[in-house]
From Swiss-Prot:
Name of the molecule in the record: Carnitine O-palmitoyltransferase 1, muscle isoform
Pathway in which the depicted protein is active: Lipid metabolism; fatty acid beta-oxidation
Positions contributing to CoA binding: 555-567
Species, as recorded: Rattus norvegicus (Rat)
Classification via SUPFAM superfamilies: CoA-dependent acyltransferases
Side of membrane Mitochondrial intermembrane, spans: 74-102
Gene: Cpt1b
This protein's record includes keyword DNA-binding: no
Residue numbers annotated as active site: 473 (proton acceptor)
Keyword check for S-adenosyl-L-methionine: no
Subcellular location: Mitochondrion outer membrane
Key words of the record: Acyltransferase, Fatty acid metabolism, Lipid metabolism, Membrane, Mitochondrion, Mitochondrion outer membrane, Transferase, Transmembrane, Transmembrane helix, Transport
GO cellular component, one term: mitochondrion
Amino acid sequence: MAEAHQAVAFQFTVTPDGVDFRLSREALRHIYLSGINSWKKRLIRIKNGILRGVYPGSPTSWLVVVMATVGSNYCKVDISMGLVHCIQRCLPTRYGSYGTPQTETLLSMVIFSTGVWATGIFLFRQTLKLLLSYHGWMFEMHSKTSHATKIWAICVRLLSSRRPMLYSFQTSLPKLPVPSVPATIHRYLDSVRPLLDDEAYFRMESLAKEFQDKIAPRLQKYLVLKSWWATNYVSDWWEEYVYLRGRSPIMVNSNYYAMDFVLIKNTSQQAARLGNTVHAMIMYRRKLDREEIKPVMALGMVPMCSYQMERMFNTTRIPGKETDLLQHLSESRHVAVYHKGRFFKVWLYEGSCLLKPRDLEMQFQRILDDTSPPQPGEEKLAALTAGGRVEWAEARQKFFSSGKNKMSLDTIERAAFFVALDEDSHCYNPDDEASLSLYGKSLLHGNCYNRWFDKSFTLISCKNGQLGLNTEHSWADAPIIGHLWEFVLATDTFHLGYTETGHCVGEPNTKLPPPQRMQWDIPEQCQTAIENSYQVAKALADDVELYCFQFLPFGKGLIKKCRTSPDAFVQIALQLAHFRDKGKFCLTYEASMTRMFREGRTETVRSCTSESTAFVRAMMTGSHKKQDLQDLFRKASEKHQNMYRLAMTGAGIDRHLFCLYIVSKYLGVRSPFLDEVLSEPWSLSTSQIPQFQICMFDPKQYPNHLGAGGGFGPVADHGYGVSYMIAGENTMFFHVSSKLSSSETNALRFGNHIRQALLDIADLFKISKTDS
């Protein structure tokens, strides 16, 4: 394999004969091409910035306005009502005239036309922002759309009809509104009523009233002031205090995973699958840089914020003693690869051209064929990213701030993303229920040192060609990486393809230089720190119980026959399953998005409601008529859907209380109410996994082209983490996590309760898979 010095532009040594310079032509060539590529990207960004800045206008529309003004002037019609002549008189004459009077008139008309054009764009964007601030459509039934909503929809379509770029709507998105304190307090008390007895509820009610009357008004004023100044009053604090200031390991506690297609297999060649996948990812990055990706649109017309996509690639979480830092680079031309305890650098470009899939396959195969042993301390080095953040920050500062260690660490942290070549094989075998769970655990934490948990995402390649992702959470939420993953899997399957022998299409360029081994000089003291982090991470990973399963009896198609939303159906089933599992209700977290607002991220839906608990209790008694149970279920479903809509439209509970708590800390004001609210454990943390954000193939035509979604670790010591994907008309996937050290939880047991709860609710409506 090539040595590390190939990556250095020049070296020099002092000899008795003078100074000896050694130039690396390959490195200098890469530096030159990198500079050329950077300038190309800058020009593209400038062009995109102009096009984005004038949306929904365009250079063509500007030219039309100018031509209309000039044409009317030659027809002796003054559409400017004298403004052109006023502009002409105001033209500066300090440095002489602008030529003939006709030239001055033409210049004045161009200035007038540009002003009219810019004013029109401004009015269009403000009108669009006002229209996008309307959310009444979310609270109406599809069959009973009001006239106001119909008119609103027509106006939105007219104003956004021109083909938008990825960030075209960013400045037209409304700001996240700050809810009123009384409204938030009322919704909070309503959410905890089913969880507290009368005495505990009256106590909480008293604390809430004291907070609302005495402390909250002052905190709210500061928060409203921030909402006027900041783009989003929540997102920066959420990123900093929930993610970057966390000092516990991010492996399991924060990072989450995503699975490959599990019902089909494109190839068993590990290197070939990676070649196609990495090529597809860089294709996506190129589209991202050029803003060629269509923004995600609700109902095909309401744009979602695309801000989180900016840091998808070339991003690393840098550890700090008190808080971490997200480092994002505008460009990266390589990936970092881990295999059998060794780290490699793989270039993605040959000159200015992206390597073809077959070339990338060859490079990855060279790594797989390499038999060189790891250097001392290299094998478990990545365990530093899996342990405590303070320990990692101290080790990084002490052992990786200079020399070859710094150079190699920079190579990893400046990579487009991280690639892990695993030695184990994983796949989903319907006849072996444990296979999906083992696959999930491998993606969630691996062996604690074969993932670089600080990278924005790690692409994981199993020996048999199966893939997966491990994603760092602070830079974005699951729908963002899901958008990339959908593109990659569809591109790999339907656009790039494989030969009959399972290799990438085409012939490799054998003249490409081989991947470069990274060089390390890790002293024993650092190796001790690595081992300590590994032991912390291993204890954490060994304590995770993960149960993943496919639910086959029915899917979205059958649930719709219950006249309820699939998400509400599953959430109510989770409440029934949890009560059967523990004999009690608990504070339940469901992640909702606020991306209809600029730089919006998530909000919490408190799924355990008085209506859902009433339904569960009625189900448990076994003495209620089916019609009564159906009515209770529909009430619970309607309540859940309404709460979800409120959360999406900025009227949630928890982000507002969280920000009030942060303000109270800044002001040094203590609130017993906020202290208690923010310390409540989420014993059941849930999330629905998005799918089909991109339409690259027809899922009805290819029903087996389904991923199994993804999952995350348990949030509470004695709680469950549940992610689910309503994968199609006839199936669902669930990922249930808990801690083995807890005597209260068992992921397998809870998963079986979920299965039975889904079947029992479906039985209420007398529907089966044959009906869907």
